[in-house]
Amino acid sequence: MATDPIHQFQISKLIPIEIGGLDFSFTNSSLFMVATVAAAGAFLYLTTSSRGLVPSRMQSVSEMSYEFVASMLRDAAGSHGMRFFPFVFSLFMFVLVANLLGLFPYFFTVTSHIVVTFALALLVIGTVLVYGFWKHGFGFLKLFVPEGVPGVLLPLVVLIEVISFLSRPISLSVRLFANMLAGHITLKVFAGFVTSLGALGVAGAAGAVLPLAMTVALTGLELLVAFLQAYVFAVLTCMYLNDALHPGH
């Protein structure tokens, strides 16, 4: 099982909990989601609680993260979009830290499960819908009626816009899930080659050099993907929130 590339994604019950026939067990996935929130919160607290005139390296990282998300939100949704900053920043930090924790050996990557990423995507789309209807009422439906469309084409265009909107949580969740899943499987496969070849003696160890080099390179690539996927998730969230703020644009 140690060399099985799929085994790392297996969810196991740590504390079985069953209420009324429903399974509410505390799993390894639950544990690492809690660990993700705790790690992100601890990092931000420790790096900003004692700010100095000359920022430390970790304080600079926190401030850069803050400004990065704030700039992203302002560019995508304007100054009014800053009311969603706590929401977008929390999502960005959760996805980023979850991705980074998953790179450690024997750690669990929560973002490699479609259930987790789809729940995050539904949270985003749910926020767009709730705020859009709360702020604009039925005027929010103008989002599905682009300006300047000929009347004869309007029903078809509206249908396409509705389908496109409903597909957003699917594309948002699958993008993150698929990238993390594929990357970790590939990394595990090459790491398995290194272990298997190394067990064959001197000749095997010589043959393990190439897979080892690939493993190191893939680890660096996965580190980049961890940041990139957090960025993509956050920037798409900003774009969707812009629709809630300005449905007629």
Curated annotation (Swiss-Prot):
* Task of the protein: Key component of the proton channel; it plays a direct role in the translocation of protons across the membrane.
What InterPro entries is this protein classified in? Answer: ATP_synth_F0_asu, ATP_synth_F0_asu_AS, ATP_synth_F0_asu_bact/mt, F0_ATP_A_sf
**Subunit comment:** F-type ATPases have 2 components, CF(1) - the catalytic core - and CF(0) - the membrane proton channel. CF(1) has five subunits: alpha(3), beta(3), gamma(1), delta(1), epsilon(1). CF(0) has three main subunits: a(1), b(2) and c(9-12). The alpha and beta chains form an alternating ring which encloses part of the gamma chain. CF(1) is attached to CF(0) by a central stalk formed by the gamma and epsilon chains, while a peripheral stalk is formed by the delta and b chains.
**Which SUPFAM superfamilies does the protein's record reference?**
F1F0 ATP synthase subunit A (SSF81336)
Q: Which organism is it from?
A: Chelativorans sp. (strain BNC1)
> Record's HAMAP family?
ATP_synth_a_bact (MF_01393)
| Compartments where located | Cell inner membrane
CC terms in the record's Gene Ontology section? plasma membrane; proton-transporting ATP synthase complex
Gene3D superfamilies from the xrefs?
ATP synthase, F0 complex, subunit A
Give the way it sits in the membrane: Multi-pass membrane protein
The UniProt entry's sequence similarity note says: Belongs to the ATPase A chain family.
Q: What is this protein called?
A: ATP synthase subunit a
